[in-house]
């Protein structure tokens, strides 16, 4: 593989096509539009279908329908569109439809600042639709991650028959890095067939609580059985985390904030303060065991986030040591500022 300068959103397009994606429905929205543009240009060249829908509600509906018909389907959006997709995501979860939803986060709420980054949709990604349901959320922190986590998103979607959200942000989506990636068209080999796909026989698919045959029911025992089955699927899910550095101060970070944490850990090391980073490549199901294990050896756990403090609540829930959340909005803070905050806690 040769080195090339490529944008994060462009890497996501290549990852999707190389993962076998053959259907994309979406509505352009900053800062995710490059994904739609790339899929519109490239997907038909590989026998796929691109449809620009009238809005994000139609987009998620089309993607779920295509998935039920056997397509490898994906959509992409940002905050306002992500909000419109929430009912559809719940429908995808209860019907066990393998779809991939890209959210390149921007500053909110409402229209917010379309060109400013944010990590404010982290909890919406996990809990945005009503009711109880499991979902997988991946969080790329680099252009390389944008490629490989997109590929992984499709593999997870089909392995667990579930919607998967790739939660990026404006920084990662629009940055350019020199990386070595597989060439466009080098299709990944994996099982691209949902376990409950229609196969020559009549099958019911409904958003109502249903039996194993897909028939609607109001029986509370069947309701509990359905929910427990949906969650039990993920007993075999292995959270994707990476630790680097040394024991001491532990940064727990995801997405573009991981880049801030990495630079800050380096500055602390230069000052003689041991520090390490636990990079969360999968946010949900939350990697409780990994966070608990690494935090036991930490003097202080620091969770930097480009929001008012969302994932830090999950970290606090499983940690027994001191946890410091650091919030910032619309942009990353300088590593020197984060180091100053950390030193004030030591």
UniProtKB/Swiss-Prot annotation:
Keywords: Oxidoreductase. SUPFAM superfamilies: Thiamin diphosphate-binding fold (THDP-binding), TK C-terminal domain-like. GO terms for biological process: organic acid metabolic process; sulfur compound biosynthetic process. Its EC number is 1.2.7.3. GO terms for molecular function: 2-oxoglutarate synthase activity. It catalyses: 2 oxidized [2Fe-2S]-[ferredoxin] + 2-oxoglutarate + CoA = succinyl-CoA + 2 reduced [2Fe-2S]-[ferredoxin] + CO2 + H(+). InterPro entries: 2-oxoacid_oxidoreductase, PFOR_II, Pyrv_Fd/Flavodoxin_OxRdtase_N, THDP-binding, Transketo_C/PFOR_II. It is an enzyme of class 1 (oxidoreductase). It comes from the Archaea. The keyword Cell inner membrane does not apply. PANTHER family: SUBUNIT OF PYRUVATE:FLAVODOXIN OXIDOREDUCTASE, SUBUNIT OF PYRUVATE:FLAVODOXIN OXIDOREDUCTASE-RELATED. Heterotetramer of the KorA, KorB, KorC and KorD subunits. This is 2-oxoglutarate synthase subunit KorA. It comes from Archaeoglobus fulgidus (strain ATCC 49558 / DSM 4304 / JCM 9628 / NBRC 100126 / VC-16).
